[in-house]
Amino acid sequence: MSRVLECSTLVSVILTKVKKGLKKNTPFLAIITFNDSKYCKLLIDKCLELDIHFKHYNLYNPNTRDVTSLIDKLNKDDEITGILLVEPLPKNIDKYACYDAININKDIDGVNPINQYYLSINRPNIVNSTVLAVIKILESYNISLSGKNVTIIGRSYNISRPLASYLINSDATVSMCHSKTRDLVSLLKNSDIVISVTGVNNLFKSSDLKDGCIVIDVGLGDVLIDSDNISYTPKTKGVGPLSIACLLENLVTSCKKLK
């Protein structure tokens, strides 16, 4: 019988921890966006709810230098303890130059290559919030990673690749699939855990999976539930709200590092 991996309780636990951290720390978040973002609105609403200080920079038609200059200014501002670039960036922007520019201790979503490197050698500094959300879900349900076959669908720099590093460090055997992968269904059939990060609606079906498979749907709708043989995260009140909670936890951590 299928099981829904409920995340609301975990969100509450993490936000309680964040509130406790706010009693001893005063973080200040800089949010950089390039268009209207539902994610940004949810994040700002949560900052207002928790009385977290923030500045929102919505850049209109910027070039790469505009963005890196702003990041450099925020790096030098002692009041700012966390910097977040909200994806997607405009196509004319060199996003990797922007990632490089963020101070590694203000990089609350772990996009700077140095933070990714530290994670790859199992010495994490700051880890991407969505990666943390995935790991916390698995841990909260006592799902061991050691020796498991884990398939990640999607090869994004921000999420899929650091997630693969985290899983490998936890002794999982990891396959990363993408648009050029042949015979995805065969890989899925052999997977103990599937983590989908594509945002492609109904990319695969639960009937493609073996009995007892765990599905973490980061893309919010990647899996079509057409059987009752798996455990899976819900489309709403799942990975998304948990990622925001983990991001705010990272913000408090960054504030501590910068003291």
Spans of model-derived segments:
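Anion-binding alpha/beta catalytic cores of soluble intermediary-metabolism enzymes, centered on
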Residues: 2-12, 16, 82-145, 202
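Generic structural signal for residues in well-ordered beta-strands
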Residues: 54-56, 174, 232
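N-terminal ligand-binding/catalytic initiation module
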Residues: 1-82, 86-89
